[in-house]
From Swiss-Prot:
Name of this chain's protein: (-)-alpha pinene synthase 1, chloroplastic
Domain of life of the source: Eukaryota
Gene Ontology BP annotations: alpha-pinene metabolic process; diterpenoid biosynthetic process; green leaf volatile biosynthetic process; terpenoid biosynthetic process
UniProt motif (DDXXD motif) ranges: 380-384
Keywords from the named record: Chloroplast, Lyase, Magnesium, Metal-binding, Plastid, Transit peptide
Primary residence: plastid
Annotated Mg(2+) 1 binding sites: 380, 384
Cellular component, GO, one term: chloroplast
Domain remark in the UniProt entry: The Asp-Asp-Xaa-Xaa-Asp/Glu (DDXXD/E) motif is important for the catalytic activity, presumably through binding to Mg(2+).
Enzyme Commission number(s) from the entry: 4.2.3.119, 4.2.3.120
Species for this entry: Pinus banksiana
Function noted in UniProt: Monoterpene synthase (TPS) involved in the biosynthesis of monoterpene natural products included in conifer oleoresin secretions and volatile emissions; these compounds contribute to biotic and abiotic stress defense against herbivores and pathogens. Catalyzes the conversion of (2E)-geranyl diphosphate (GPP) to (-)-alpha-pinene and, to a lower extent, to (-)-beta-pinene.
Pathway(s) per entry: Terpene metabolism; oleoresin biosynthesis; Secondary metabolite biosynthesis; terpenoid biosynthesis
Lineage of origin: Eukaryota, Viridiplantae, Streptophyta, Embryophyta, Tracheophyta
Length: 629
């Protein structure tokens, strides 16, 4: 417990306005310096003189004792970001990548022209699946959308209720191609049933393999495990496949020598699918793919795939540097460094965004996500620890007025918080308006107001020491998790159209939004409840469950929450991938992947409060360090 520090905002703030070149070739940050101005009001500049503080209505900071979180400081200062080199932004690298893209497209097309006498139908299907799987895991699939669809349409034409066999009329099926086909086809929205896996059980109803663990057999079980992770609700056979294959692979790791295969197995077991962020997977798979001779296809130019993957990784690295430089200027210009009561994780949030969306044209999404999450973190620390209940009630009312003059009743430190919320939400709405061709501000404001209301409810519980029922806490906690406000404006800045009927399937009242919010609340609480309780925050999913179920232990509660998380993940999979949906996967993918990004942040611990271990490693591996060509 430490006394409050009164924080004064600088009189001159540099307000960033971004112009994102959707071609991806340029990112031009524009800074407008406005003397004695710290705010905008729907296009009107608001001077500090026009919002002078009314001392009679302000909450006094004198002698207020405040709680503070024990958080480490920002790990990535401006000097470090500026010192990063980005040699792969030169045009010659882009030109080389474009040539390789053409050659890889030729490799895809050549699969349709193979001599039918020189390759069996099964080998042909495996090669097509391998090619699609490889470009996706290497992070270069965005260049081959047409070729991927053609390959998968061909594979799907051979799909039967027993999976994939040696031909359309064959009664002999193959587990490797069936498992890889089930996973890949399902991820692209094809209607494929997991029941095909029942045909690979023995008479006892168990999955079985020979005792001798050959490399081919290990790879088959690895593909079975990867397929089992794309499970939908109620698919018992997928649970059985996951249990069997996970045990088999863990046993194999103890026996096979250290190799690209053992590393691949280790990575898949470590991250699964829901926390294996695409750019992290690409970074890891580049290393594995470069050493992997046993999984190469004779007629495919695997070295070209690898070279292209490395070039694309590093070319994006150059764009990341420019975006980071802009983000740091925004962070400094917003007055954030003076907010010493909260965590500063803008670089970490940008990293998560760039791990799930590394298309060059989606700069607005990446930067918008980082900004929104920074605001969420500031508000989280203010409502949970630093602010008094009276101050928070005033702030909540001020947000609903959406007018800088509302800050007259706020203490000085809250003025800065209010204005970063106000300015940033308005600026992101302007970007969304341009992308969507309609006004989005009022809709997005409503989302932020509901989010603030949920925080206010939690602040009241903290102040009173009340532990609500699990249902009451859980429903409020899904809103206060921040998933909706972290996703809404960033996805609206993309080049994907979101008419009202599509937005309803991604935002409220969609099941996708509800489940994504649920996993953030549930997983976050399992990682944070002990630290929160030490700071006086009694209510959590764990404590509320124990209150509702007298006699249960923390272990019982955690087991229950973890089972809920498993079910939520399956529900999320279904909402994203359900066949014949009126909303394309592409419209839902960013919101879905945001849930994966947050889930990764809580995989080992609260990676947002303690960002100096796994989260720091993620930043270095996917943003700071290029790969060696």
């Amino acid at each position: 417990m430490s006394p409050v520090s009164v924080i004064s905002l600088p009189s001159d703030l540099c307000l960033p306005t971004s112009f994102i070149d959707r071609s991806g070739r340029e990112l031009i940050p524009l800074h407008i310096t406005i003397p004695n101005v710290a705010m905008r009001r729907q296009g009107k500049l608001m001077t500090r003189a026009s919002m002078s503080m009314n001392l009679r209505t302000a909450v006094s900071d004198d002698a207020v004792i405040r709680r503070r979180g024990d958080f480490h400081s920002n790990l990535w200062d401006d000097d470090f970001i500026q010192s990063l080199s980005a040699p792969y932004g030169e045009p010659s690298y882009r030109e080389r990548a474009e040539r390789l893209i053409g050659e890889v497209k030729n490799s895809f097309n050549s699969m349709s022209n193979e001599d039918s006498e020189s390759i069996t139908p099964l080998d042909d299907l495996i090669q097509r699946l391998w090619m699609v799987d490889s470009v996706e895991r290497l992070g270069i699939d965005r260049h081959f959308k047409k070729e991927i669809k053609s390959a998968l349409d061909h594979v799907y034409s051979y799909w039967s209720e027993k999976g994939i066999g040696c031909g359309r009329e064959s009664v002999v099926t193959d587990l490797n191609s069936t498992a890889l086909g089930l996973r890949t086809l399902r991820l692209h929205g094809y209607d494929v049933s997991a029941e095909v896996l029942n045909h690979f059980k023995n008479q006892s109803g168990q999955f079985a393999c020979t005792l001798k663990q050959t490399e081919d057999q290990i790879r088959t079980v690895l593909n079975l495990y990867r397929a089992s992770l794309i499970a939908f609700p109620g698919e018992k056979v997928m649970d059985e496949a996951e249990t069997f294959s996970a045990k088999y692979l863990k046993d194999a790791l103890q026996k096979v020598p250290v190799s690209s295969l053992s590393r691949e197995i280790g990575d898949v077991l470590e991250y699964g699918w829901h926390t294996y962020l695409p750019r992290l997977e690409a970074r890891n798979y580049i290393d594995v793919f470069g050493q992997d001779t046993g999984n190469s296809q004779s007629y495919m130019k695997t070295e070209k795939l690898l070279e292209l993957a490395k070039l694309e990784f590093n070319i994006f690295h150059a764009l990341q540097k420019r975006e980071l430089e802009y983000l740091v200027r925004w962070w400094k210009g917003s007055g954030s460094p003076q907010m010493t009561f909260c965590r500063h994780r803008h670089v970490e949030y940008y990293t998560l965004a760039s791990c799930i969306a590394f298309e060059p044209q989606h700069s607005g999404f990446r930067l918008g996500f980082a900004k929104a999450c920074h605001i969420i973190t500031v508000l989280d620390d203010m409502y949970d620890t630093f602010g008094t209940l009276d101050e928070l009630e005033l702030f909540t009312s001020a947000i609903k007025r959406w007018d800088p003059s509302a800050t007259e009743c706020l203490p000085e430190y809250m003025k800065g918080v209010y204005m970063i919320v106000y300015n940033t939400v308005n600026e992101m709405s302007q970007e969304a308006d341009k992308a969507q061709g309609r006004d989005t501000l009022n809709y997005c404001r409503q989302a932020w107001e509901e989010y603030i209301d949920a925080y206010m409810q939690e602040a009241k519980w903290i102040a009173s020491g009340e532990v609500p029922t699990f249902e009451e806490y859980y429903e409020n906690g899904k809103v206060s998790s921040g998933h909706r406000v972290s996703a809404l404006q960033p996805i609206l800045t993309t080049d994907i159209p979101f008419p009202e009927h599509v937005l309803k399937e991604v935002d409220i009242p969609s099941k996708l939004n509800d489940l994504a919010s649920a996993i953030l609340r549930l997983r976050g609480d399992t990682r944070c409840y002990q630290a929160d309780r030490a700071r006086g925050e009694e209510a959590s999913c764990i404590s509320c469950y124990m209150k509702d179920n007298p006699g249960t232990t923390e272990e019982d509660a955690l087991n229950h929450i973890n089972a809920m998380i498993s079910d939520v993940i399956k529900g999320l999979n279904w909402e994203l991938l359900k066949p014949n949906s009126s909303v394309p996967i592409s419209a839902k993918k960013h919101a879905f992947d945001i849930s994966r990004a947050f889930h990764y942040g809580y995989k080992y611990r609260d990676g947002y409060s303690v960002a100096s271990i796994e989260t720091k490693s993620l930043v270095k591996r996917t943003v700071i360090d290029p790969v060696t060509l």
